[in-house]
């Protein structure tokens, strides 16, 4: 599990992208060939969790801006919302190197992404959305409480305040 020996920060030239290999070859290819260019072009912010002692990238995720139509938001979350598109952050891509699978790093990366979006003060974001790959949809639904959008059930949505409230109640329960 992630601890003080691991570091998370923006992707840079110094990170060993060539050694990264996750279970999904599309994600591996994206990280090796396109992530740095996307970061430099400001298409997406790419955050990497790495072990500086081993010169290994453990995992990464991308964040970019997006919007969701009001009508797509689950009705139970629409009270007091404006009737126009809502600003959200897209958790676009995420991967964990095969050597680190099954150790809780995927969950740690999602929590880090949610906390990063919640704490930032540069732009407003009401929620996070994700388009999960086949086989990981339940991870977002069950572990974090994401819900399907009304008009696109393949795209999942999590109100940031819901995440913070859940995190606070989990902390109090410990």
Give names to the regions the model predicted:
Residues 60-93:
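Conserved acyl-donor/pantetheine-binding loop and adjacent beta-alpha core of acyl/acetyltransferases
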Residues 110, 134-136, 153-160:
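Short glycine/proline-centered loop/turn elements that form peptide/ligand docking sites
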Residues 1-41, 53-56:
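Short amphipathic alpha-helix that is part of the acyltransferase structural core
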Residues 92-102:
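A short, internal acetyl-CoA/4′-phosphopantetheine-binding micro-motif in the GNAT/acyltransferase core
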């Amino acid at each position: 599990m992630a601890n003080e020996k691991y570091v998370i920060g923006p992707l840079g030239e110094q990170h060993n992208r060539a050694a990264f290999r996750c279970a999904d070859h599309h994600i591996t290819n994206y990280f090796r060939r396109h992530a740095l260019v996307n970061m430099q072009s400001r298409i997406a912010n790419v955050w990497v969790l790495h072990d500086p002692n081993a010169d290994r990238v453990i995992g990464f995720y991308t964040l970019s801006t997006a919007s969701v139509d009001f009508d797509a938001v689950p009705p139970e979350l629409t009270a007091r919302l404006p009737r126009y598109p809502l600003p959200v952050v897209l958790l676009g891509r995420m991967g964990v190197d095969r050597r680190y699978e099954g150790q809780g790093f995927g969950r740690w990366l999602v929590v880090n992404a949610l906390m990063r979006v919640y704490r930032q003060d540069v732009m407003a974001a009401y929620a996070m959305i994700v388009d999960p790959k086949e086989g990981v949809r339940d991870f977002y639904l069950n572990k974090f409480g994401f819900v399907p959008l009304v008009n696109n059930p393949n795209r999942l949505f999590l109100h940031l305040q819901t995440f913070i409230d859940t995190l606070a109640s989990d902390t109090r329960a410990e």
